[in-house]
Amino acid sequence: MGLIKKIFGTHSEREIKLIRPTADKIEALEPDMMKLSDDELRGKTIEFKNRLKNGETLDDILVEAYAVVREAAKRTLGNRAYYVQLLGGIILHQGRISEMRTGEGKTLTSTFPAYLNALEGEGVHIVTVNDYLAKRDAEWMGEVHRFLGLSVGCILNDMDNDERRKAYNCDITYATNNELGFDYLRDNMVIYKEQLVMRDLHFAIIDEVDSVLIDEARTPLIISGQSGKSTRLYEACDILARQLTKGTAKELSKMDIIMKEDDQETGDFVVNEKEKAVNLTAEGVEKVERFFKIENLADPENLEIQHNIILALRAHYLMAIDKDYVVKDDEVLIVDDFTGRIMPGRRYSDGLHQAIEAKEHVKVKRESKTLATITFQNFFNKYTKKCGMTGTALTEENEFREIYGMDVVEVPTNRPVARIDKDDAVYRTKREKLNAVINAIVEAHKAGQPVLVGTITIEASEEISELLKKKNIPHKVLNAKFHELEAEIIADAGQKGAVTIATNMAGRGTDIKLGEGVTELGGLKIIGTERHESRRIDNQLRGRSGRQGDPGESCFYICLEDDLMRLFGSERLNTIFKSLGLPEGEQIEHKMLSGAIEKAQKKIEDNNFGIRKNLLEYDKVNNEQREIIYAERRKVLNGDSMRDVIFKMITDNVETCVNTSISDDQLPEEWDLAELNQMLLPIIPMEPVELKDNELRHMKRNELIHMLKEKAVKLYEEKEAEFPEKEHLREVERVVLLRVIDRKWMDHIDDMDQLRQGIGLQAYGQRDPKTEYKFSGFEMFDTMINAITEDTVKALMHVRIEQKVEREEVAKVTGTNRDESVAKAPVKRATKKVQPNDPCPCGSGKKYKHCCGGVGRI
């Protein structure tokens, strides 16, 4: 393999070779562009648009368009794009991922494909990881686009619908991945076309593409409302969890399994940190049964107790404060494992968040009901074309290609990387490692060399901060607790003598520029205090030093007590190093170590990829169903032939009722008309079906269906005649159908969740869980479609002209993952309330509860 690479070069080198001629042509146009006046340069935009209308393609005008953008950036920002940025811009236009090192100017690179693709007039979305970067880039890079006559918008969390609509209608829109995803979901919940804010998803340029499409791929975007479920069980389970004793389980060897040895478990429960799972022992099950006064915890009616006690134990033994979450203002806030940022509004699902709230003695919020949901994988695959930029993507190249169909091309740096990446410094214990880290910081600080210390948890950053205070070393801490000061702290991290401690540096988005005299001192020194489970995150930390050919150095300090080493095979290493009799504090150097670390990281990366791939396979079923529902919903929203749709629903309902109550092989005298009436009349309030003997003898089932269809259609035509303007009824039909679709779809999402949670049991029956999930999911989907038809006809057949159609605004989402929407106040009516046993106001002669009171009111 190494020989082939030497002869033919890497994949990236071969691809770069192919696009260099295009970049050379752009370079050659620079003198011509410099001669143009501002107005002439601006006029090129109209010229390009006309050329596209006349049949030219984007590829035809790419060279000239990129030369125009380069000159515009020089005049507005004072920045002349490097040759490598032109290469990156060409790769992005091709719908690929451009891997560009930190400090190589990814932000400016994005202006090239953004301008070119915006000329089509269908909108370009530039996706950033936070509001700060979206606003900054829209103002900063927006200058280039505005100079060239394009409109630039920015979506921020606190914007209303009118502001969002205006921003999405711009040629180029900057927004976070979360805002885009939520706006897409909200657009598929609106009742009126005028409430839509987005255009079609045309072209997306994703900054920090690995963070968005890989790190956040497992977290679905969820819009949710409050459910009526009590929170007392969480509090009760938390009390019990504190009383249970943690035990251990002996891992069975192959010989034990052959000899049919039983698991040797102690205590009430055991924790498996590798699998992030908790299991009750037989003793623990008995204690739970005694506590809740139940006979058998495994009974179906006790599944909720079983689920909640496991959640409480997970909250206590697998979720750590200041690592996985922080408590701020009487609220539990999640910390992003990859970026170290707080994620306001995001809540763990399946009740885990409530279990943590009970553990931390803050107010336990009620569980929420999912109204709409989508994963980033499926959302970004909806774009006609997408591309991405990042400093580190090659380690996940296979995943990008397999799941997103995106190629990764490494762009060469503008200047050679001068940073020195040292081998890992390995110690036996955490105490020895921390001493070595502090000594390295003190030494660099004395020399005036700036130091950036990267930690994995908030707890670790605060521990190092305390140790530095004892040494009187001035420093700044950047973690999820203090992220408001983020940009300011990072901007100063390259100054002489600066010491900065930061939790994961992924997606920080701010360059660290070296202060005066720092280059001579060796540049920025990076110290990693622990290896992350992803090599990519380690590379991102390293990449903060040595930008644009600056000097720098990086080194990771690790010990055999670190989580990564502890969980993945350090026991054997520990035994070996103990036997060597090394004195305390001495650094261990052994070729086995680097191999063990690399192997552990690769193992976790492969495992995480497997989880994401598995999630996508299950979500594919949900996605296909979502596509159908949202497409049908959009047709209704646009008002496409509503009358025909409703009449078909009415006739379909008649046919379903007849086919269900009367089988094909029954003789007419065997027909159960009472059952038919029982099914049909609550939906379509027609006269009961009564046939005399002589009528029955000469009637076929198809004739009965035809007769009932005619009656039902006539009944609805009479309803139609009650409306002075036909468009009023069409409006009512639209609103009723949309609300029924939304209600049934929300229930279906819950049902699919329940199915997903229980589908693993199918494996015990020698059946493939994924196949069963797909089969059962589509059966449930068919049932939902039939229910939508039935409920819509039922509601419309009972609608009255005096009833006002209420416009309903969709709940605004203010979170990164979930929205705990406040329940809406009921709509007040001026009319007198009708009691269930009163005569129905519609004049049918029936009691209200058996007539209009039995159907959904509008």
Curated annotation (Swiss-Prot):
It is found in: Cell membrane; Cytoplasm. The keyword Chaperone does not apply. Keywords: ATP-binding, Cell membrane, Cytoplasm, Membrane, Metal-binding, Nucleotide-binding, Protein transport, Translocase, Translocation, Transport, Zinc. ATP binds at residues 85, 103-107, 511. It is a peripheral membrane protein. GO terms for molecular function: ATP binding; metal ion binding; protein-exporting ATPase activity. The keyword Lipid metabolism does not apply. GO terms for biological process: intracellular protein transmembrane transport; protein import; protein targeting; protein transport by the Sec complex. GO terms for cellular component: cell envelope Sec protein transport complex; cytosol; plasma membrane. InterPro entries: Helicase_ATP-bd, Helicase_C-like, P-loop_NTPase, SEC_C_motif, SecA, SecA_CS, SecA_DEAD, SecA_motor_DEAD. Its main location: membrane. Pfam families: P-loop_SecA, SEC-C, SecA_DEAD, SecA_PP_bind, SecA_SW. Its EC number is 7.4.2.8. PROSITE patterns: SECA, SECA_MOTOR_DEAD. It catalyses: ATP + H2O + cellular proteinSide 1 = ADP + phosphate + cellular proteinSide 2. May bind 1 zinc ion per subunit. Its cofactor is Zn(2+). Zn(2+) binds at residues 840, 842, 851-852. Part of the Sec protein translocase complex. Interacts with the SecYEG preprotein conducting channel. Has a central role in coupling the hydrolysis of ATP to the transfer of proteins into and across the cell membrane, serving as an ATP-driven molecular motor driving the stepwise translocation of polypeptide chains across the membrane. PANTHER family: CHLOROPLAST PROTEIN-TRANSPORTING ATPASE, SECA INNER MEMBRANE COMPONENT OF SEC PROTEIN SECRETION SYSTEM. Monomer and homodimer. Part of the essential Sec protein translocation apparatus which comprises SecA, SecYEG and auxiliary proteins SecDF. Other proteins may also be involved. Belongs to the SecA family. This is Protein translocase subunit SecA. It comes from Lachnoclostridium phytofermentans (strain ATCC 700394 / DSM 18823 / ISDg) (Clostridium phytofermentans). The gene is secA.
